[in-house]
């Protein structure tokens, strides 16, 4: 019996006919590996500057809406608006986004580039929302990860522990971070990260455990509630005038809110 391609028509045959049906193995057994995909496609974005990469992350949602309006082509690659089946070699917005984050993380190995990224990414909405302190390369790498597909990035060598620790942090701080469970299931994301690590045979030995603790220490110092305070400080002089008009001192009001 010859094997057939996994198509809509052949699925119908599988469900409605008495003949034996088997699909080609390259379609139902080959799992997607983002690490391999990234290695094969990073050249597509090699011309992107650090600033351009950061611009992409800062405007991710707006860019995604434009890209998904129709088939989007850049260079020789097309992100299809509609696709019944996403193949292992197909480019998707999520894969593109993850590649850009990996590229930026690699750039942090250079001190000059690290300084540029640190200065620019501090103003990104998610970094401010998390109240993430940017003190060193590890904290900057965490900042780059925020908002990205952690399960995809977890497959890249040396990014396993930063991925699993960030996934755990998000799962443990759902309410504090204002994460909407119906839009992003943190428990499911953590499960996917662990599945990726297990499939690549990753071992959490003492060295990896210590590495994870360093990332956990940084995340434990985050203050998700700091965003509002930072914004209030920005308008400090103006706010004080209005507080006084209501007969309330600004400092007392802020202390009450905190």
Curated annotation (Swiss-Prot):
Cellular compartments per GO CC: helical viral capsid; ribonucleoprotein complex; viral nucleocapsid
Entry's localization field: Virion
Any Pfam family hit: Tospo_nucleocap
GO molecular function annotations of the record: RNA binding
Principal location listed in the UniProt entry: virion
Keywords: Capsid protein, Helical capsid protein, Ribonucleoprotein, RNA-binding, Viral nucleoprotein, Virion
Superkingdom to which the source organism belongs: Viruses
Domain remark from Swiss-Prot or TrEMBL: The N-terminus and C-terminus are involved in homooligomerization and play an essential role in viral RNA synthesis.
Protein family membership: Belongs to the tospovirus nucleocapsid protein family.
Function statement: Encapsidates the genome protecting it from nucleases. The encapsidated genomic RNA is termed the nucleocapsid (NC) and serves as template for transcription and replication. The NC have a helical organization.
Self-association and partners: Homotrimer. Binds the viral genomic RNA.
Name of protein: Nucleoprotein
Organism the protein comes from: Tomato spotted wilt virus (strain SA-05)
Organismal lineage: Viruses, Riboviria, Orthornavirae, Negarnaviricota, Polyploviricotina
